[in-house]
C-alpha cells in the first residue's frame, strides 16, 4: 500500500510587502493597502501545482458552440480531455466584446465607457496570467485572427505579458 501523498496546505502568499507601497497623500491607495495587508490568505490544496510543467492553453471565443466541436478534432480533444467551463458567461459591457477578453486575461472588471485593453497598455500589469506564468519559466503567446492593431491589442497584449501574433504580424 502506497502512503497517502502529502498535501501542502500552507497559505498562498504573494511576496509583497504592503508597508513598502507609497501611500502618502493618496487615500485610495491607503485604503487598498490597509485592506489587502489585513486579509487572511487562502490555503493551498490538492489542486495547487497539479499542472506544474504542463502546457496551458486558454481559449477565449466571442461566440462558441459545442454543436460543431466534433468537426475540429484538436478543439474536440481539448474540450473533452481538458477543463471545459460550460457556464462561464461575461456580461454585456458598454464598450465592446473585447471587455470579456479583458476580464478573462486580467482577472479584473473593465472600466465602463473606455477601451480597457488600450488603457491597460499604459499600466503595470504584473498579476496577469501571462506575467505569472513567465515568472515560472513559461512562454506566453496570444493569437488573434484579425489585424494586429485591432482593439489596440498590439499595445495591450505585450504589456499583459504575451508574445502577440495576429494578421500582419506572424499570422
Model-derived features: positions:
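Soluble catalytic regions of membrane-associated enzymes that act on cell-envelope
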Residues: 2-171
Amino acid at each position: 500500500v502506497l502512503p497517502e501523498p502529502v498535501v501542502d496546505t500552507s497559505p498562498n502568499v504573494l511576496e509583497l510587502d504592503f508597508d513598502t507601497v507609497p501611500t502618502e497623500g493618496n487615500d485610495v491607495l491607503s485604503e487598498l493597502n490597509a485592506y489587502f495587508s489585513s486579509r487572511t490568505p487562502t490555503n493551498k490544496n490538492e489542486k495547487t501545482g497539479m499542472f506544474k510543467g504542463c502546457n496551458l492553453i486558454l481559449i477565449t471565443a466571442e461566440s462558441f458552440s459545442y454543436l460543431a466541436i466534433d468537426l475540429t478534432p484538436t478543439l474536440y480533444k481539448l474540450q473533452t480531455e481538458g477543463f471545459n467551463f460550460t457556464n462561464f458567461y461575461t456580461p454585456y459591457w458598454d464598450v465592446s466584446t473585447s471587455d470579456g477578453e479583458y476580464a478573462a486575461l486580467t482577472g479584473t472588471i473593465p472600466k465602463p465607457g473606455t477601451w480597457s485593453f488600450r488603457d491597460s497598455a499604459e499600466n503595470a500589469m504584473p498579476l496577469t496570467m501571462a506575467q505569472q506564468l513567465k515568472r515560472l519559466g513559461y512562454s506566453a503567446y496570444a493569437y488573434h485572427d484579425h489585424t494586429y492593431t485591432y482593439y489596440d491589442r498590439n499595445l495591450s497584449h505585450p504589456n499583459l505579458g504575451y508574445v502577440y501574433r495576429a494578421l500582419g504580424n506572424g499570422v
